[in-house]
């Protein structure tokens, strides 16, 4: 049971989940077999020069400076499985020495000047949701490390309804942006899975993608201008125009910069009227291949809805296992009748069928037209409408996945997600190749039970798709399971690249994938990036070290 009340699964009994996990992984998962967390683990001491503190106190209040152990620990990691395992069971070798909470752009620029004067390194912090080791501190770093938590810079500075733009501070969290804009009848439309906790600055720094990009675009489509505090001063412009041809666009340097070039302080973004209609939907397909062909035709022949996702059979079963305890009576009867119709009348095989979940947004006319086109194309590929409620539930489950992952770690199960983008012609083979490679490698190492390997197509483009993988296994008896997992994930990443996929669609590079950069870009490209870093930040004030850009 997930505690609290924020999520749809909160407070609900899930009687089928652990038995399903036990059967699927072929492992000894039960309430008496628990790996008890040791949080908080050993916390490294803080080392801050008195002179640096004295300089900070000239422009910051005492409640903007925090050296407490747990605060520093929380700012020293993201959400990779390795980081979660470390804070639960071992330790992080290096964490920030101090956390600073600026409340104005002037304080950010003053902080950078003080950091330069006292040879201190700065790591920007948004929501802490990254899964690339982007926040992990280098254990070799001898300088004082400052985590710059931007979340107090969270204001919407202005809204222009006539030109449909808004200026927002970089520390604003996604759910707060949505709530504030809604008061004015508008939305930004950017909803990554981490929207509850991630920030506008983090979205830009990681070049993020949202689940509704089909309607609103990815972050690079939404941001019109960005203001950045750098080691040399402020990067800003006088206006935000619809489009410009003014030479090299320095704003674009910040997309995917991952904290290595400066601190994003605000951005001007596009906004949209709140949709007149929002509807969910879902479609069942007899096989993953049939569902994939449907998505291909949908991208070619129609306007895809705000979001469309296709999950494979194992992920479909995972969702069924998370259904709450039934109230009995008519609910049970309805469920049995639906299962009978799908498997007996329609002939769908339980261990081959897959599901597609949908979100439609727009005017009533737009949504009606999209639904008509989509369900017509789905029927051509053997698809069967499965109702709005199943679609809504599928998207709500998105927000609980991280908690389920962390819950399962207590039962000796380690798991993580990784993603890629790939042309249509290589996508199906890539899915199969990655699943086969991981399964074979797992067996070769004689690890316990069976691995959990599943995939979903989570974004569609005219030229290809984004594919999201989940991988996990039972780790009891495996020494250093987080390292074993990382080795296997790197093997999966190797197979992704061999199969024509990208290094990342929206998670980014961080430190987790920097070793793969020579596989995807030329030596000249890498040297240009390093040269840019040395030119803009010669003293490596922004010392996150992501992408190998460490001065």
PLM region spans:
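Glycine-rich tight-turn/loop motif centered on a GG-T
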Residues: 97-99, 141-145, 165, 414-419, ...
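C-terminal substrate-recognition/cap domain of FAD-linked oxidoreductases
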Residues: 11-31, 62-86, 292-491, 499
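Extended, charge-enriched "interface" segments that sit outside catalytic cores
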Residues: 1-48
């Amino acid at each position: 049971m997930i505690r609290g009340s924020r999520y749809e699964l909160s407070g609900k009994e899930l009687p089928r989940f652990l038995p399903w996990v036990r059967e699927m992984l072929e492992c000894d998962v039960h309430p008496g077999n628990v790996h008890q967390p040791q949080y908080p683990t050993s916390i490294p001491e803080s080392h801050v020069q008195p002179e640096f503190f004295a300089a900070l106190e000239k422009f910051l209040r005492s409640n903007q400076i925090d050296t407490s152990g747990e605060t520093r620990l929380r700012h020293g990691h993201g959400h990779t499985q390795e980081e979660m395992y470390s804070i639960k069971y071992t330790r992080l070798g290096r964490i920030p020495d101090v956390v600073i909470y600026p409340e104005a752009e002037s304080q950010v620029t003053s902080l950078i000047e003080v950091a330069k004067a006292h040879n201190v390194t700065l790591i920007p912090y948004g929501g802490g949701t990254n899964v690339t080791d982007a926040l992990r501190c280098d254990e070799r770093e001898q300088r004082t490390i400052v985590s710059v938590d931007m979340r107090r810079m969270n204001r919407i500075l202005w809204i222009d309804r006539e030109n449909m733009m808004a200026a927002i501070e970089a520390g604003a969290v996604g759910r707060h942006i949505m709530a504030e804009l809604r008061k004015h009848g508008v939305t930004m439309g950017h909803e990554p899975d981490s929207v509850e906790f991630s920030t506008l600055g983090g979205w830009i720094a990681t070049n993020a993608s949202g689940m509704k990009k089909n309607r609103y675009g990815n972050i690079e489509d939404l941001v019109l201008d960005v203001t950045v505090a750098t080691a040399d001063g402020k990067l800003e412009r006088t206006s935000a125009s619809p489009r410009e041809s003014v030479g090299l666009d320095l704003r674009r340097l910040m997309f995917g910069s991952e904290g290595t070039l400066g601190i994003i302080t605000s951005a001007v973004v596009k906004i949209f009227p709140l949709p007149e209609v929002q509807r969910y939907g879902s479609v069942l397909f007899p096989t993953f291949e049939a569902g994939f062909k449907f998505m291909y035709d949908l991208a070619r022949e129609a306007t895809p809805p705000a979001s469309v996702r296709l999950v494979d059979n194992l992920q479909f079963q995972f969702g069924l296992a998370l259904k709450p305890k039934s109230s009995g009576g008519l609910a049970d009867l309805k469920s049995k009748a639906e299962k009978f119709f799908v498997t007996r009348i329609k002939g769908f095989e339980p261990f081959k069928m897959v599901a597609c979940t949908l979100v439609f947004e727009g005017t009533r006319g737009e949504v009606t037209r999209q639904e008509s086109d989509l369900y017509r194309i789905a029927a051509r590929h053997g698809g069967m409408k499965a109702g709005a409620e199943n679609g809504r539930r599928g998207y709500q489950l998105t927000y609980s996945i991280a908690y389920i992952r962390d819950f399962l770690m207590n039962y000796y199960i380690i798991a993580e997600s990784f993603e890629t983008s790939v042309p249509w012609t290589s996508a199906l083979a890539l899915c199969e190749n990655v699943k086969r490679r991981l399964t074979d490698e797992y067996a070769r190492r004689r690890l316990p039970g069976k691995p959990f390997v599943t995939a979903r197509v989570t974004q569609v483009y005219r030229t290809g798709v984004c594919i999201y993988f989940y991988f996990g296994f039972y780790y009891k008896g495996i020494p250093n399971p987080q390292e074993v997992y990382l080795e296997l994930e790197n093997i999966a990443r190797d197979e992704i690249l061999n199969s024509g996929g990208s290094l990342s669609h929206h998670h980014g590079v961080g430190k987790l994938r920097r070793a793969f950069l020579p596989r995807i870009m030329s030596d000249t490209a890498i040297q240009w990036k390093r040269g840019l870093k040395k030119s803009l930040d010669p003293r490596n004030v922004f010392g996150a070290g992501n992408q190998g850009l460490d001065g």
